[in-house]
Structures are given as C-alpha cells and as structure tokens.
Design a protein with these regions (language model features):
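Acidic, glycine-rich flexible loop segments
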Residues: 152-165
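Juxta-kinase regulatory segment immediately upstream of eukaryotic protein kinase catalytic domains
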Residues: 1-31, 145-152
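Active-site ExK catalytic segment of metal-dependent nucleases
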Residues: 51-58, 100-102, 192-194
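Conserved hydrophobic "DFG−1" position in protein kinase catalytic cores
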Residues: 44, 98-101, 182
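ATP-binding glycine-rich loop module of kinase domains
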Residues: 28-92
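Conserved structural core of kinase catalytic domains
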Residues: 76-154
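Protein kinase-like catalytic core scaffold
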Residues: 50, 74-77, 95-97, 169, ...
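Catalytic activation segment of kinase domains across protein kinase-like and atypical kinase folds
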Residues: 164-197
Length: 197
C-alpha cells in the first residue's frame, strides 16, 4: 500500500535522489545546483527566470519536452531543449532542458495543492483494487468530478495531464513532495507529476 504524504506537518516524505554527478557541458559550467530528485538535477541559470534541468527519465523528458505535452498556465514552460548531454547510471540518456524557475508552494497555491493531493489520494484509495492503474483512474475522476473549490483552469490542467498519461508509458505522481510547485505570481504548477512504472 502506498503511504499518504503529510500535507499539513511541513515534513516531506524522503525521496531517493539521483546520485550521478552533474554532466560536463558548457552551459552548466560554474552553475550552482539548487535541487535534485529521483531522476533529475536542477541548476540555477545566470538569471532568476530560468533553470537548467538535467533529466534522466524518459517520463520527465516526455512531460517537459514532447511536442504534444500538456501546456497552459499550470504546466512548466520549456525555453530550450539542449539535447543529450551524457548517460546516467540508470542507463538512460541525460537530456538538458532550460525551463522556467519555479518555487516551493506557499499561500493559496499550497492550499490548492493540498486540495488536489487529497482528491488524488482519495481516488487512489477508492481505486486501490486497480493496482498500478489506480492513479490514472484517480486523475481521470478528478477531471470528471472535481472537488468543490478547484479552479476551472486547474481542472482543465488535470484533464490534459490525464490525456497525456493515456498516450505515454507513464504513471501520475501527485503525492511526491516537490511535484507541485508555483510561479512567483502564485500560480500552481504541475512541475513533475509523472514517472516510469
């Protein structure tokens, strides 16, 4: 059974981080690492608006860079795909993406994030007998019957994410801390909501 993350205590569930070093690339020389996840490394760019994200998971690459990826106000903006920059220890290629800089959730975005995570968790519990497909069903049902108070733009984003997941060999992950972030203006962003099963 999956463990429900604490959304109120401020304590994040521990996430295994990619152990690989930052790959050598001229665009990354001298940049500061600001984040690391299960399959990615984030480095600050020379301005406050962009970051460089080195991804080793095809799921992350599809989500952030595919031509038919979901787009809109609740999805990260891709500025450039700089291609393959090495090979990760997991066997996949490292790809270098330049995306918008996002921030940890706070204020109203944090409240919307909690609402979305709670609805997703409830759906996962409801559809637990569906095994690995429970997350897909939970997402689909949020789009079809959203919780009260979820803005129409976020419902539309959840529907777009649900459609994307049906087309790619990925599963949704809204429970992992850091998969929901926000822009400086407070807009909730589905920053990294997919993984390879």
């Amino acid at each position: 059974m999956i463990e429900r993350p604490s959304t109120d205590s401020g304590q994040a569930t521990e996430v295994a981080c990619l152990a690989d070093p930052v790959p050598a690339h001229p665009l990354l020389d001298g940049l500061t690492e600001i984040g690391r996840g299960e399959s990615s490394i984030v480095l600050a760019s020379r301005d406050d608006k962009h970051v460089f994200k080195v991804v080793s998971s095809p799921a992350d690459y599809f989500y952030l860079a595919a031509d038919d990826r979901p787009t809109g106000i609740h999805f990260p903006h891709l500025f450039a795909d700089h291609g393959i920059v090495g090979k990760a220890s997991n066997g996949y290629s490292f790809r270098l993406l330049e995306i918008e800089r996002l921030l940890p959730l706070a204020g109203e975005a944090a409240e919307l994030g909690r609402m979305l995570v709670n609805a997703y968790w409830e759906g996962c519990e409801k559809w637990a007998n569906m095994g690995v497909n429970r997350g897909r069903l939970a997402l689909y049902h949020i789009a079809q019957d959203p919780p009260a108070g979820l803005p129409a733009s976020l419902v539309k984003a959840v529907a777009a994410l649900s459609d994307f997941i049906e087309e790619y060999p990925v599963q949704p992950d809204l429970l992992n801390p850091g998969n929901l972030m926000m822009r400086g203006d407070g807009t909730l962003v589905l920053s990294d909501p997919v993984f390879l099963p």
